[in-house]
């Protein structure tokens, strides 16, 4: 997290005008909608549930959610993307969320992708670069309706953190587990 905040520090100087204007709202979309954040655009192209992803299997009572996304850097300089930018949620419970399996959330260390189309935990994006790939989450069985959320985060010159808009993309994942969810 600290590395992420440092990476955004330079961008935050330019973002001060935005945070001074309020921010803190939310936007929502559906599969195929392009969400336009301060730093990048992203689209959830499709999503499905599976019991196996490139040899990776979930723990008992869980399935894997595979979301195909496209990200485009629309900022005026290169940025570093993190898989933890994209949180998946399945209901309103306090613990009803997960981060991609490419980050160990107990140690905050990056884990190697297991699939060839899977986005890594961290990756650079040049100005106007666009990248598509899969985010893989371990989620409880029995759910097919999800949202992927992104929260804009800024750091000013003094190290003060603030947040901007939150973006939600709602979708129903196709069940490919072989069992009804």
Predicted ranges, named:
Residues 17-20:
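C-terminal motif of bacterial Sec signal peptides marking the signal peptidase cleavage site
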Residues 1-12:
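Positively charged n-region of N-terminal signal peptides that target proteins for export
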Residues 22-24:
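Bacterial signal peptide processing site
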Residues 72-129, 155-157, 171-175:
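The feature marks short-to-medium sequence segments in extracytoplasmic or secretory-pathway proteins
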Residues 131-164:
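Short, surface-exposed ligand- or partner-binding patches at beta-edge/loop junctions that are enriched
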Residues 48-66, 77-79, 122-126:
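Short, solvent-exposed beta-strand/turn "edge" segments of beta-rich domains on protein surfaces
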Residues 166-181:
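Short, low-complexity, Pro/Ser/Thr/Gly-rich segments in the mature regions of secreted, periplasmic
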Residues 28, 32, 126-130:
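Solvent-exposed, conformationally flexible loop/turn segments
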């Amino acid at each position: 997290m600290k590395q992420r905040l440092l990476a955004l520090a330079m961008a935050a100087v330019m973002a001060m005008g935005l945070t001074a204007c309020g921010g803190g709202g939310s936007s929502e979309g559906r599969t195929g909608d392009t969400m336009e954040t301060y730093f990048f655009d992203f689209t959830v192209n499709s999503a499905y549930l599976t019991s196996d992803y490139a040899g990776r299997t979930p723990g008992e009572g869980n399935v894997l959610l595979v979301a195909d996304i496209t990200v485009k850097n629309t900022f005026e300089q290169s940025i570093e993307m993190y898989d933890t930018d994209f949180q998946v949620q399945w209901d309103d419970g306090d613990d009803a969320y997960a981060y991609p399996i490419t980050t160990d959330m107990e140690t905050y260390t990056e884990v190697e992708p297991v699939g060839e189309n899977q986005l890594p935990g961290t990756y650079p994006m040049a100005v106007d670069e666009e990248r598509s790939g899969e985010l893989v989450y371990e989620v409880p069985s029995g759910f097919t309706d999800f949202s992927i959320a992104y929260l804009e985060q800024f750091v000013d010159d003094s190290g003060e953190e603030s947040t901007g808009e939150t973006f939600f993309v709602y979708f129903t994942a196709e069940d490919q587990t072989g069992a009804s969810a």
